[in-house]
Design a protein with these regions (language model features):
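Extended, low-polarity transmembrane helix blocks
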Residues: 1-181, 191-276
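Transmembrane-helix motifs of polytopic, lipid-linked glycan transferases
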Residues: 184-188
Length: 276
């Protein structure tokens, strides 16, 4: 990895963020909507702040590299010694497992995280949602089967599940679970805290909304979140995961908080970062 390549990665990341904001959201660049006190997460100032963070992260990474660059060679030892093991392409291993390519995950994190935070903020501020009235209305419309028409819900078992939740008034408390769940997923992705887990619960909500017949932005967020889940080891490196993952570890690699050790200087989960 060289400084020039890092500059290219930074440009690609910034461009991808702009494309996502342009293609899958409306009005995120409007200068007359820079700040909304009643919808803070939707304020367009965050578009420019997040874009600036991507650029700053890229420039910082480039300046930290030696002028000669760093040789990156993903290991393929497992495929060579394990019978039946199929090795992944080098570019895929680098993208999902090398922190020097984590810049490319910033636009996905920022876009998906902001969408979740904005959706959650709207629900938290809505008194009708807080009482469960809005959710009850949504479920009622979803389970309805119009005469001669196509029901919103394709699968009968899911319609029965929502009907059960309606009959037992789950909406009185489940509305808060959804609202604050969206807020937490959004914050987790934006600050890079347990990105894989946050993205996973985001896909659970996307999947549930789609099963209930609501398309909206759910297919887009679901697809982008799947990639964040796959890249969980490095997607949050420019964020709190840089420190959280080595501390907490995984079921197959104990974190330093449980071993009483000192985190490595530039850590990744599952082992130390090789810089040569």
């Amino acid at each position: 990895m060289t400084r020039q390549k890092t500059y290219i990665l930074t440009a690609i990341s910034a461009g991808l963020f702009l494309v996502l904001c342009w293609a899958f959201a409306d009005g995120l660049f409007a200068l007359d909507s820079l700040w909304h006190s009643d919808a803070i997460a939707e304020s367009t100032i965050w578009t420019y702040v997040l874009l600036a963070l991507i650029v700053v992260a890229g420039l910082y990474q480039a300046r930290r590299l030696p002028e000669s660059g760093i040789a990156i060679h993903p290991s393929n030892e497992a495929a060579m010694v394990t019978p039946g093991q199929v090795d992944d392409p080098v570019w895929w291993k680098l993208l999902l497992g090398n922190v020097y390519f984590s810049l490319l995950w910033l636009p996905l994190r920022f876009f998906v995280g902001r969408e979740w935070l904005a959706a959650g903020e709207h629900k938290v501020r809505d008194s009708a949602w807080g009482t469960g009235e809005s959710l009850a209305g949504y479920w009622t419309g979803a389970v309805a089967v119009p005469e001669g028409g196509r029901p919103a819900i394709t699968y009968g078992w899911y319609r029965d599940l929502l009907q059960y939740m309606l009959d037992h008034k789950w909406y009185t408390w489940f509305a808060d679970v959804i609202a604050w769940g969206e807020v937490l997923v959004g914050i987790g992705l934006l600050v890079g805290a347990l990105v894989g887990i946050a993205a996973f619960f985001g896909t659970v909500m996307n999947f549930s909304f789609q099963l209930a017949g609501s398309a909206s932005s759910n297919p887009v967020l679901f697809g982008l979140s799947v990639f964040l889940i796959l890249a969980w080891k490095v997607a949050g490196f420019w964020g709190l995961d840089r420190y959280l993952l080595p501390l907490l570890g995984t079921p197959w690699h104990r974190g330093t908080i449980f071993e009483g050790g000192t985190p490595p200087t530039t850590p990744v989960v599952g082992g130390n970062l090789r810089t040569n």
